[in-house]
A protein has these predicted regions:
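A compositional/biophysical signature of low hydrophobicity enriched in polar/charged and small residues
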Residues: 1-152
Length: 152
């Protein structure tokens, strides 16, 4: 356990391909029953229970939020809209997209912030490009993306 300033570095749990398959099902299906997860990944229900208990104890699964397993990332995408842009229309469109949990209209330098969950930085880049291309020219003036490092 090494302390680096106010952040405590913890060793990352070892997650194999079966664990990743289970995590993928959980990410897509929330709290799917063990039997359904077992069918989808091709193992017994008991194996799924054992693996999930181990991942819970290791902190990979916490409150049924997947964290620090090398699967997925969460980002906050702040958008500043151009003059005359319909903030509600833009927010409503983005809010319905896969990978976007929600979109808030906010005060401050930005007008909107989208809470985004994607597999990796490549998927994040694709989503950002999709946002820019979906908006009519001039509707988005800038974006600023912040990666979430930890959820408490």
């Amino acid at each position: 356990h090494t302390n680096i300033g106010p952040i405590s570095a913890q060793p990352m749990a070892i997650v194999d391909s079966l664990d990743r398959a289970i995590l993928t099902v959980l990410r897509d299906s929330g709290r799917a029953p063990f039997v359904d997860i077992a069918k989808q990944v091709g193992v017994t229900e008991r194996t799924v229970r054992t693996r999930m208990r181990r991942m819970e104890e290791a902190g990979v699964i916490r409150g049924y939020t997947i964290r620090e397993a090398g699967i997925g990332l969460t980002a906050l995408v702040r958008l500043k809209v151009g003059p005359g842009a319909e903030i509600g229309t833009l927010a409503g469109e983005f809010a319905g997209w896969e990978g976007i949990e929600c979109v808030y209209e906010i005060s401050g330098d930005a007008d909107l912030v989208a809470v985004v969950h994607v597999d990796d930085t490549v998927a994040l880049r694709v989503l950002l490009e999709k946002m820019w291309h979906a908006a009519p020219p001039g509707e988005i003036s800038t974006t600023q993306t912040e990666l979430v490092l930890e959820q408490y």
